[in-house]
Amino acid sequence: MERVGCTLTTTYAHPRPTPTNFLPAISTMASSYRDRFPHSNLTHSLSLPWRPSTYYKVASNSPSVAPYCTRSQRVSENTMLPFVSNRTTFFTRYTPDDWYRSNLTNYQESNTSRHNSEKLRVDTSRLIQDKYQQTRKTQADTTQNLGERVNDIGFWKSEIIHELDEMIGETNALTDVKKRLERALMETEAPLQVARECLFHREKRMGIDLVHDEVEAQLLTEVDTILCCQERMKLHLDKAIAQLAANRASQHELEKDLSDKQTAYRIDDKCHHLRNTSDGVGYFRGVERVDATVSVPESWAKFTDDNILRSQSERAASAKLRDDIENLLVVTANEMWNQFNKVNLSFTNRIAETADAKNKIQTHLAKTLQEIFQTEMTIESIKKAIKDKTAFLKVAQTRLDERTRRPNIELCRDMAQLRLVNEVHEVDDTIQTLQQRLRDAEDTLQSLVHIKATLEYDLAVKANSLYIDQEKCMSMRKSYPNTLRLVGFC
């Protein structure tokens, strides 16, 4: 800035700019004392009595800065600056020592800041390296633990797979023996089993066909003679069913455990091979605070071991039951001869009676279906007629509605109005008549449909009875079973 006045106090027209750096640029410092104070032009001949004029410059006029004077003291450009009586106003604010001390302070602060920054950088670099090595070691330890966990899971998984294969094999073997026992009871075990299956299937007859006929009497006689074999087979069959349920429950636990092990193996193996550069890594805030674990390594291993022990126990019981069933089939295969021909003759007579009744029902059903078709056609024609009349009714009512909007005296009850009203009543009566006829036709159709349903049900009953007697029962009794079939092989 331009200094004006005496050496006692220096007055500036504007405040000193705040430096943005520790040391301002030389150009800034040099220019800060030039042409900063616009004032009225002072002639070069102006002399200041208390200071030689060679040490001061005459202030130049700057259009960007207002003169340093009050409103009442403003003068024109050609007016000279009067002498100021207050000498203290023009003295400088700082001494050279202050200036040097300020610079020295800035230098020291700069050195201190740079020293602290350098120390921080060195410490930070060392900290980064230490933490990097520590993090890598921690990750390596975690990776090793994951690898050990994967090996543990793999061991128990192989144990489960081995036991599961054994259990599946035993379950399949018991299932085969059970099927042989069922075949002996239902299809191939001598007269007792044939009679038992025939009675069982004939209980599936429906409606009026559930009669106590000659066939049932002969079958009951056949069953009574060999009831003891039947009870023994059913007892062992129930045991086999219960054992299969136990085997499947144990197998289910093994399969569930194996599925969990496979999932855990896949997850832990993925985690074991996961690296910093792997795809799919990301931030999951707060996941380390979520403890969703439900077991410890000891309880985890004991859980799988208990499942394997339970499976082994069930396999031993299943093998013993298979041996008992095998012995039972061999014993009961030699105890079966009774009333075979009488039962077959009774079946033949009953099948003929049922077939004749079925043919008559089919004839009535065909006629009923034809009548239903005709009635449905009538209903459709009535509906079409009603729909056609509805269009006429809409037009007439629309005309009446539009004519209600005639203004004032134009609302005349003329011939057109009367004809429209009559037309609405006439069409409405026609629709009502057709709707009544439609209801009558629908009632008739419902009656026909009910009769059809009754005939169809009766036909299904007869067809079911024929299927049971002819296909189910007689197919089992076409020939006497041989020894292999009596023990369940066929």
UniProtKB/Swiss-Prot annotation:
Keyword Ion transport attached: no
Tissues of expression: Expressed in spermatozoa. Expressed in airway epithelial cells.
Post-translational modification: N- and O-glycosylated. May be proteolytically processed during the epididymal transit of spermatozoa.
Cited Pfam families: Tektin
Consequence when changing residue 183 to Q: In SPGF81; uncertain significance; loss of protein expression in vivo in patient's spermatozoa, but no effect in transfected cells
Glycosylation sites: 7, 9-10, 41, 86, 103, 111, 276, 344
GO biological process: one example: cilium assembly
Function in brief: Microtubule inner protein (MIP) part of the dynein-decorated doublet microtubules (DMTs) in cilia and flagellar axoneme. Forms filamentous polymers in the walls of ciliary and flagellar microtubules. Required for normal sperm mobility.
Quaternary structure and partners: Microtubule inner protein component of sperm flagellar doublet microtubules. Interacts with TEKT1, TEKT2, TEKT4 and TEKT5. Interacts with CCDC38.
UniProt-annotated location(s): Cytoplasm, Cytoskeleton, Cilium axoneme; Cytoplasm, Cytoskeleton, Flagellum axoneme; Cytoplasmic vesicle, Secretory vesicle, Acrosome outer membrane
The family this protein is said to belong to: Belongs to the tektin family.
GO cellular component term of the entry, any: microtubule cytoskeleton
Presence of keyword Ubl conjugation: yes
Keyword field: Cell projection, Cilium, Coiled coil, Cytoplasm, Cytoplasmic vesicle, Cytoskeleton, Flagellum, Glycoprotein, Membrane, Ubl conjugation
InterPro entries registered for this protein in UniProt: Tektin-like (IPR048256), Tektins (IPR000435)
Coiled-coil segments: 424-451
Disorder this protein is connected to according to its UniProt record: Spermatogenic failure 81: A male infertility disorder due to oligoasthenoteratozoospermia and characterized by reduced progressive sperm motility. Patient spermatozoa exhibit acrosomal hypoplasia and detachment of the acrosome from the sperm head.
Domain of life where this protein originates: Eukaryota
Bilayer topology term: Peripheral membrane protein
Protein name as catalogued: Tektin-3
